[in-house]
Protein backbone atom coordinates (compact mmCIF):
# COMPACT_ATOMS: atom_id res chain seq x y z
CA UNK A 1 0.00 0.00 0.00
CA UNK A 2 1.24 3.49 -0.89
CA UNK A 3 0.55 6.49 1.32
CA UNK A 4 1.27 10.20 0.95
CA UNK A 5 3.55 11.65 3.62
CA UNK A 6 5.27 14.96 4.29
CA UNK A 7 8.57 15.02 2.34
CA UNK A 8 9.81 18.58 2.86
CA UNK A 9 8.78 21.72 4.72
CA UNK A 10 9.96 25.32 4.77
CA UNK A 11 8.50 26.44 8.09
CA UNK A 12 7.56 30.10 8.61
CA UNK A 13 9.11 31.84 5.61
CA UNK A 14 8.25 35.49 5.01
CA UNK A 15 6.53 36.41 1.74
CA UNK A 16 8.67 39.01 -0.03
CA UNK A 17 6.44 39.63 -3.07
CA UNK A 18 3.03 38.90 -4.58
CA UNK A 19 3.02 39.25 -8.38
CA UNK A 20 -0.48 38.97 -9.83
CA UNK A 21 0.73 39.47 -13.41
CA UNK A 22 2.95 36.37 -13.56
CA UNK A 23 1.49 33.01 -14.58
CA UNK A 24 1.00 30.87 -11.51
CA UNK A 25 3.48 29.38 -9.04
CA UNK A 26 5.72 30.30 -6.13
CA UNK A 27 9.27 31.56 -6.64
CA UNK A 28 11.60 30.30 -3.90
CA UNK A 29 15.26 31.21 -3.29
CA UNK A 30 17.45 28.37 -4.60
CA UNK A 31 19.30 28.14 -1.25
CA UNK A 32 15.99 27.35 0.47
CA UNK A 33 15.11 24.78 -2.20
CA UNK A 34 18.43 22.98 -1.71
CA UNK A 35 18.15 23.02 2.07
CA UNK A 36 14.56 21.75 1.99
CA UNK A 37 15.19 19.05 -0.63
CA UNK A 38 12.71 20.63 -3.07
CA UNK A 39 13.02 21.14 -6.84
CA UNK A 40 11.58 23.46 -9.50
CA UNK A 41 8.26 22.19 -10.83
CA UNK A 42 7.46 20.30 -7.64
CA UNK A 43 3.90 20.61 -6.36
CA UNK A 44 3.69 22.38 -3.00
CA UNK A 45 0.97 23.13 -0.49
CA UNK A 46 1.06 26.61 1.05
CA UNK A 47 -0.47 27.61 4.39
CA UNK A 48 -0.58 31.33 5.23
CA UNK A 49 -0.28 31.84 9.00
CA UNK A 50 -1.63 35.40 8.80
CA UNK A 51 -4.96 34.78 7.09
CA UNK A 52 -5.50 31.01 7.18
CA UNK A 53 -5.45 30.56 3.39
CA UNK A 54 -4.32 27.16 2.11
CA UNK A 55 -3.64 26.37 -1.54
CA UNK A 56 -1.48 24.36 -3.95
CA UNK A 57 0.90 25.54 -6.64
CA UNK A 58 4.30 24.58 -8.08
CA UNK A 59 7.86 25.82 -7.54
CA UNK A 60 9.92 28.16 -9.70
CA UNK A 61 13.59 28.52 -8.76
CA UNK A 62 14.49 31.98 -7.45
CA UNK A 63 17.85 33.69 -7.35
CA UNK A 64 20.24 32.03 -4.92
CA UNK A 65 20.78 34.07 -1.75
CA UNK A 66 17.93 36.48 -2.51
CA UNK A 67 15.57 35.31 0.24
CA UNK A 68 12.79 35.54 -2.33
CA UNK A 69 9.40 34.01 -1.57
CA UNK A 70 7.06 35.34 -4.25
CA UNK A 71 3.52 34.13 -4.91
CA UNK A 72 2.64 34.55 -8.57
CA UNK A 73 -0.56 34.71 -10.59
CA UNK A 74 -3.85 33.88 -8.89
CA UNK A 75 -2.01 32.79 -5.71
CA UNK A 76 -0.90 36.41 -5.28
CA UNK A 77 -4.50 37.18 -4.26
CA UNK A 78 -4.18 34.83 -1.28
CA UNK A 79 -1.15 36.44 0.42
CA UNK A 80 0.37 39.81 1.25
CA UNK A 81 4.07 40.69 1.40
CA UNK A 82 5.37 40.04 4.94
CA UNK A 83 2.83 37.25 5.56
CA UNK A 84 4.37 34.16 7.15
CA UNK A 85 3.84 30.95 5.17
CA UNK A 86 4.55 27.26 5.55
CA UNK A 87 5.56 25.56 2.29
CA UNK A 88 5.11 21.77 2.23
CA UNK A 89 5.67 19.00 -0.30
CA UNK A 90 4.56 15.40 -0.06
CA UNK A 91 5.73 12.08 -1.50
CA UNK A 92 4.10 8.74 -2.14
CA UNK A 93 5.86 5.82 -0.55
CA UNK A 94 5.30 2.33 0.64
CA UNK A 95 3.58 2.13 4.02
CA UNK A 96 6.52 0.31 5.63
CA UNK A 97 9.06 2.80 4.23
CA UNK A 98 6.89 5.68 5.48
CA UNK A 99 7.10 4.40 9.06
CA UNK A 100 10.79 5.27 9.27
CA UNK A 101 10.96 8.14 6.78
CA UNK A 102 12.09 11.50 8.20
CA UNK A 103 11.02 14.63 6.29
CA UNK A 104 13.38 17.53 5.67
CA UNK A 105 12.20 20.54 7.69
CA UNK A 106 13.96 23.92 7.63
CA UNK A 107 13.37 27.10 9.61
CA UNK A 108 14.55 30.16 7.64
CA UNK A 109 15.68 33.34 9.37
CA UNK A 110 12.44 35.31 9.87
CA UNK A 111 13.93 38.63 8.74
CA UNK A 112 15.89 37.52 5.66
CA UNK A 113 14.56 34.06 4.70
CA UNK A 114 18.18 32.89 4.69
CA UNK A 115 18.95 29.29 5.59
CA UNK A 116 19.71 28.93 9.29
CA UNK A 117 22.31 26.24 9.95
Curated annotation (Swiss-Prot):
Please give the CDD domains that the UniProt record associates with this protein: Asp_decarbox
Note whether Transport occurs among the keywords: no
For the biological process aspect of GO, one term held by this record is:
alanine biosynthetic process
| Pyruvic acid (Ser), modified sites | 25
Broad EC category: lyase
Q: What does the note accompanying the cofactor annotation read?
A: Binds 1 pyruvoyl group covalently per subunit.
What's the catalysed reaction? L-aspartate + H(+) = beta-alanine + CO2
Active-site feature positions: 25 (schiff-base intermediate with substrate), 58 (proton donor)
Q: InterPro entries in the record, alphabetically? A: Asp_de-COase-like_dom_sf, Asp_decarbox
Q: What is this protein called?
A: Aspartate 1-decarboxylase
